[in-house]
A protein has these predicted regions:
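Active-site glycine-rich loops that stabilize anionic/oxyanionic intermediates
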Residues: 23, 27-31, 105
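Alpha/beta-hydrolase active-site loop
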Residues: 71-91
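Alpha/beta-hydrolase-fold enzymes
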Residues: 111-198
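A short loop-to-beta-strand scaffold at the N-terminal edge of the catalytic core in hydrolase folds
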Residues: 3-14
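Conserved alpha/beta-hydrolase
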Residues: 40-66
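The serine-hydrolase catalytic nucleophile loop
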Residues: 29-40
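Alpha/beta-hydrolase fold nucleophile elbow
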Residues: 94-105
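Glycine-rich nucleophile elbow surrounding the catalytic serine of serine-hydrolase chemistry
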Residues: 103-113
Length: 204
């Protein structure tokens, strides 16, 4: 909804049956909606109308690989607007059934933010891989982010923020840290992530 990019979305559903609900998937950082294909197919088989989209700066919602990880001037504000647009589309396609919003990792934080403003528009929410930090750490992260933007601009990259967030998880797996072992216990999932160009980029 920034007037520049076409937001890529995907739907999974069985048109021959009566849907028992809508499931909107909100993906996490450094991934894209079609990674959820196997799960979404299962949910569609169970009777759900499943929908999701690639956030701005992710997957196919970019105009080129160089835009991966770039959030633009409004950043997460646009992500929330896109989530609401997708919700409206799904509600129109499958009205009068329970509406559930599922967020994974970064997506869980977006869903939490969405619920603050529009919680009455959904019937339920599933938060996977979410978390909470102490207020002093949150303030430190914000200060670091603002300092980085002042120095490098909004599309800059902060190694310090990486270490404070995602890259810091690797410390728990020192023998295999570079493979992103913290993401999954399944070796094939880790290998797929390393070989996927849509998952190997730096966040602005």
């Amino acid at each position: 909804m920034d007037g520049i990019h076409m937001i890529h979305g995907y739907r999974w559903y069985d048109p021959s049956r009566k849907w028992i609900g809508v499931l909107q998937i909100v993906h996490g950082m450094l991934e894209y909606i079609e990674r959820y294909d196997e799960f979404a197919e299962k949910m569609a088989e169970a009777g759900y109308y499943v929908i999701g989209h690639d956030h701005l700066g992710h997957g196919d919602s970019v105009n080129g690989a160089e835009e991966l990880g770039k959030l633009g001037e409004e950043g997460a504000v646009l992500w929330l607007k896109d989530m609401e647009l997708v919700r409206r589309m799904a509600s129109a396609a499958a009205p009068k059934v329970p509406y559930i919003m599922l967020g994974h990792s970064m997506g869980s934080y977006l869903v939490r933010r969405y619920l603050i403003y529009h919680g009455e528009r959904v019937d339920g929410a599933i938060l996977m891989g979410t978390g909470q930090q102490r207020l002093p750490l949150v303030k430190l992260g914000l200060l670091t982010a603002y300092a980085g933007m002042f120095r490098d601009g909004r599309n800059g990259h902060s190694r310090i923020l990486d270490l404070m967030s995602v890259s810091g998880f690797a410390k728990r797996y020192p023998d295999n840290a570079r493979t992103g072992s913290w993401m999954s216990r399944n070796p094939q999932v880790l290998l797929d992530a390393l070989q996927d160009s849509k998952r190997n980029f730096h966040f602005s």
